[in-house]
Amino acid sequence: MPAFRLPVRQLVEFLLRTGSIDSRFTGFDRANEGARIHRKLQKAAGEGYAAEVFLSGEREAAGIPFTIEGRADGIFTDEAGVTVIDEIKTTAVPADDIAEDMNPCHWAQGMVYGAICAQQRELETLDVRLTYYQIDTDEIIRYTRHFSAAELDAFLNDLLRQYLPWARRQLDWVEARDRSLGALQFPFPAYRPGQRALAG
């Protein structure tokens, strides 16, 4: 069975996102503005800060192989020698209202990247840092949490267990589609020159 490919953000938001009419984290022009601010903060972080780090990890849940992947905003090693996953978020929420537990998806995203990074680098511990950039005042608010690799691993495995019903549905649909396509007959008595090669 081929691996079920799952972007980190999709996994986290599918399971943990809650409804809200608060659009201060998203918006029409926010994506471009957010990307510009990400680059600004990443550049200011200095030497030793790796920006936009692609991470991909293999996991299995109930016999289904998963490939979980995405780009961590930043990874660096702090003064104490601890690897830190930096998750950057731009927001219009007033700085006084930017709380550590404001959005569980933000921590979850960093923790999933942390689980993959810890596995790849064989780390026993790792920090996840949320960097909030307030777009109206240019204020930067940071929160950091320390995790063991075992905690991060258990967190990711739990998310995958929760996601299993949807993964199974999608895999069943793909299997049914492929069976149906395999049973289709070519609607004409013969292929035209080159048509068979094009059809595969």
Predicted regions and their residues:
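Short, compositionally biased low-complexity segments
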Residues: 2-20, 125-132, 168-178
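Conserved aromatic-histidine-acidic binding/catalytic patches
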Residues: 25, 29, 98-105, 190
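Generic recognition of stable, solvent-exposed alpha-helical segments in well-folded globular domains
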Residues: 36, 105-108, 147-158, 190-197
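Polybasic (Lys/Arg-rich)
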Residues: 150-182
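Mg2+/Mn2+-dependent nuclease catalytic core
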Residues: 58-153
